[in-house]
């Protein structure tokens, strides 16, 4: 409010008059952008379907300079040692192929706790059709890591396209 009071004084009015005549106040910062660029956000772990932990590095398989084999790779938002696969699998139509194994989630959480994670992103294959495994995982995380931020891809970006879901969920978890 101090900033608005200074603004009102600068334009020769009172704060009450300024607010009365104002229909919208918009405030923008670069805090979120800086957290991503500087890698200074939360310590995030990623749980994903077993065998798919490298999707952040694989991206969509495309490179800006596709034939340049020496092109430097960008570091993924979440390092590989904090990206863990768990036993579960949904089919593309949303039916369960492999039931969620709570013991595998528990073991993965032990690893993330040991690595100091205070935020956990969860992105399972085909969870946009049926988020049950992600929701069950969230309950397990909250029981074991009650102070951790939990971010589910089925909440953030429930769409087809695995890389987009994983990367959006990872950014949100930062």
Name what the model sees in each region.
Residues 1-174:
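N-terminally biased helix-coil "hinge/interface" segments that flank
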């Amino acid at each position: 409010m101090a900033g608005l009071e200074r603004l009102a004084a600068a334009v020769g009015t009172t704060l009450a008059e300024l607010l009365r005549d104002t229909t919208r106040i918009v405030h923008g910062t670069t805090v979120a952008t800086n957290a991503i660029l500087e890698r200074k956000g939360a310590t995030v772990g990623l749980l994903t379907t077993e065998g798919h932990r490298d999707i952040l590095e694989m991206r969509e398989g495309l490179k800006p300079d596709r034939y340049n084999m020496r092109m430097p790779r960008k570091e993924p938002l979440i390092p590989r040692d904090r990206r863990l696969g768990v036993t579960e699998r949904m089919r593309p139509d949303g039916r369960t192929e492999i039931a969620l194994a709570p013991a595998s989630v528990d073991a993965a959480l032990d690893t993330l706790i040991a690595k100091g994670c205070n935020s956990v992103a969860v992105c399972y294959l085909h969870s946009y059709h049926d988020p049950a495994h992600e929701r069950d995982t969230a309950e397990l995380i909250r029981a074991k890591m009650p102070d951790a931020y939990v971010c589910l891809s089925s909440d953030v970006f429930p769409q087809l396209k695995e890389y987009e879901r994983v990367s959006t969920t990872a950014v949100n978890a930062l």
